[in-house]
């Protein structure tokens, strides 16, 4: 006759074995356009995120290297259906059609989290005077309202000193300040009220916000953004990929207060697509 203790162990083992695995977060990376090696960066980001968290990344890539790249994923009205988060890696400075921008923003306005990388901050410029601060709540400020920050350009590439200004935030907790390779430091024309600065970057005497969060619209959608990430070496840097992955998990509500993935969302829990 088997002992009660042995039966308990067997029962617990069977229960754990039968427990369904946590489904991975479904992320869509929209990437392509002007001025960057997106053919390489799409793979770096996809692999880097999936190695760090229980996330399945689909890629919507445009090989168009112009400033008005076309993305097939945006053609459907319900283009974001089935996804838990969208990563915007577009470089689409001259897409200024308000209807198109509203289509891109529609799921975020309803609560779908967003992550925005580097040149996404210089995309969807619907105001011809984007080089000056644009008022919130206007057609010209649509994309900036979503981001929580308005940037219009950058200077020459040189190393950026990264300083974490809020080391207690789950996204940045435990991270050490560092210096990038030669990179582009984006300017800040306006940091919106409600945006939370997490890090600043410095080149010489110029210092700007380079990492922040925002709550967008009435749904208070979680949005995470960083202006870092021009060069492949930076995008492939483990410190950068750690940041992006944490930002994604935070946006989805899957990052605990210590900066670790919540149960089931760490890399060991990942499953095949």
Each PLM stretch: what is its role?
Residues 20-25, 40, 51, 81, ...:
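Extracellular ligand-binding/catalytic regions of CAZymes and related secreted enzymes
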Residues 88, 93-173:
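A glycine-rich, often tryptophan-bearing local segment used as a flexible ligand/cofactor-contacting loop or short
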Residues 32-35, 91, 155-160, 229-238:
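Active-site rim elements
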Residues 20, 26-30, 37-123:
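Helical hinge/lid and interdomain linker segments adjacent to catalytic or ligand-binding clefts
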Residues 29, 40, 44, 99, ...:
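Extracytoplasmic/secreted proteins, especially bacterial periplasmic and envelope-associated proteins
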Residues 5-15:
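Bacterial N-terminal signal peptides
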Residues 113-115, 196, 222:
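Proline-centered loop/turn at the N-terminus of a beta-strand
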Residues 50, 56-58, 149-220:
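Catalytic beta-strand/loop cores that center a nucleophilic Ser/Cys/Thr
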């Amino acid at each position: 006759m088997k002992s009660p203790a042995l039966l308990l162990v067997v029962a617990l083992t069977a229960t754990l074995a039968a427990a369904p695995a946590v489904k991975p977060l479904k992320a869509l990376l929209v990437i392509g356009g002007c001025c960057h090696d997106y053919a390489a960066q799409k793979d770096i980001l996809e692999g880097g995120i999936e190695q760090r968290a229980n996330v399945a990344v689909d890629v919507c890539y445009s090989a168009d290297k112009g400033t008005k790249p076309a993305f097939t994923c945006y053609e459907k009205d319900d283009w974001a259906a089935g996804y838990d988060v969208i990563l915007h890696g577009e470089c689409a400075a001259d897409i200024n059609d308000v209807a198109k921008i509203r289509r891109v923003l529609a799921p975020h306005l309803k609560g779908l989290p967003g992550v925005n990388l580097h040149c996404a901050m210089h995309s969807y410029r619907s105001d011809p005077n984007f080089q000056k601060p644009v008022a919130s709540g206007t057609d010209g400020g649509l994309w900036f309202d979503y981001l929580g920050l308005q940037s219009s350009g950058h200077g020459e590439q040189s190393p950026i000193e990264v300083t974490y200004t809020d080391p207690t935030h789950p996204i940045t907790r435990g991270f050490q300040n560092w210096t990038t390779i030669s990179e582009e430091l984006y300017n800040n024309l306006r940091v919106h009220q409600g945006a939370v600065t997490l890090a600043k970057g410095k080149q010489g005497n110029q210092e700007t916000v380079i990492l922040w969060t925002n709550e967008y619209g009435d749904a208070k959608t979680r949005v995470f953004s960083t202006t870092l990430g021009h060069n492949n070496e930076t995008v492939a840097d483990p410190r950068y990929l750690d940041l992006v992955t944490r930002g994604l998990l935070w946006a989805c509500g899957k990052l605990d207060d210590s900066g670790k993935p919540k149960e089931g969302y760490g890399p060991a829990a990942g499953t095949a697509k």
